[in-house]
């Protein structure tokens, strides 16, 4: 994508941004992942990001060598709406704007707590997730996925615009996934529904995004590290 949202500076061409900036579109997510897989699989296409797990139960990755997770992500410019064990669901994302390096002046200070992954550390950059909105063309998509030993998922995506000039838009996205993962005895149940309402006026755009998200993991694995000393 040739443009990205840079905090208080608004939408800018990536060629005019004085930072290392990358914008990943919905097409990128479709190419490198699917709705049942962790977002980190897509993020690692950015050269400053490395994924520390391929597990669909967590969103653990590093940027410039510093551990990060869903805590560090912004949703439509708002920080701290997600948490360590999972970031934004893939199926609600229209675009991800990734800014590497110090940029608190334009994006503010993002969450720095890594939870059980090592405590608080300075955020090495920001990841702003932009959610899907209703476009000019109506959308009606239904997707099924199968992964692990018996994990079955269903996803729905519906959008319409209405009004005399199509000024009102609504988009509804939902998911239900349940079953056994590849790790023996590990189970995951995930269900969510999100709605995006927007109005495009002559001089302004208003957008409201809301949803409900529920994730339950049973007997999931966690990573470990070696201590700094041995006796």
Over which residues does each language-model region extend?
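Solvent-exposed coil/turn segments that connect beta secondary-structure elements
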Residues: 26-27, 48, 66-68, 78, ...
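Transmembrane beta-barrel wall of Gram-negative outer-membrane proteins
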Residues: 139-141, 146-230
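A beta-strand signature from Gram-negative outer-membrane beta-barrel systems
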Residues: 91-143
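Mobile, glycine-rich extracellular loop/lid and propeptide segments
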Residues: 57, 69, 80, 89, ...
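Short, well-structured beta-strand/strand-turn elements
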Residues: 47-57
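Short, acidic, small-residue-rich periplasmic hinge/interaction motif at the N-terminus
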Residues: 1-30
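Periplasmic plug
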Residues: 23-26, 31, 42, 59-113
């Amino acid at each position: 994508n040739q443009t990205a949202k840079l905090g208080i500076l608004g939408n800018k061409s990536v060629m005019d941004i004085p930072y290392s900036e990358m914008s990943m579109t919905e097409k990128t997510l479709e190419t490198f992942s699917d709705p049942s897989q962790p977002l980190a699989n897509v993020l690692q296409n950015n050269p400053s990001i490395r994924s520390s797990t391929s597990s669909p139960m967590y969103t653990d990755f590093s940027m410039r060598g510093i551990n990060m997770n869903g805590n560090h992500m912004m949703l439509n410019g708002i920080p701290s709406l997600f948490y360590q064990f999972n970031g934004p669901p893939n199926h609600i994302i229209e675009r991800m704007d990734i800014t590497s390096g110090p940029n608190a002046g334009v994006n503010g200070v993002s969450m720095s707590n890594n939870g059980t992954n090592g405590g608080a550390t300075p955020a090495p950059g920001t990841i702003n997730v932009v959610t899907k909105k209703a476009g000019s063309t109506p959308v009606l998509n239904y997707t099924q996925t199968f992964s692990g030993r018996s994990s079955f998922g269903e996803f729905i995506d519906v959008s319409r615009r209405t009004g005399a000039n199509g000024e009102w838009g609504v988009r509804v996205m939902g998911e239900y996934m349940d079953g056994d993962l590849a790790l023996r005895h590990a189970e995951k149940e995930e269900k969510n529904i999100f709605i995006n309402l927007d109005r495009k006026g002559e001089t302004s755009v208003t957008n409201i995004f809301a949803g409900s998200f529920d994730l339950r993991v049973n007997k999931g694995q966690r990573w470990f590290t070696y201590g700094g000393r041995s006796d």
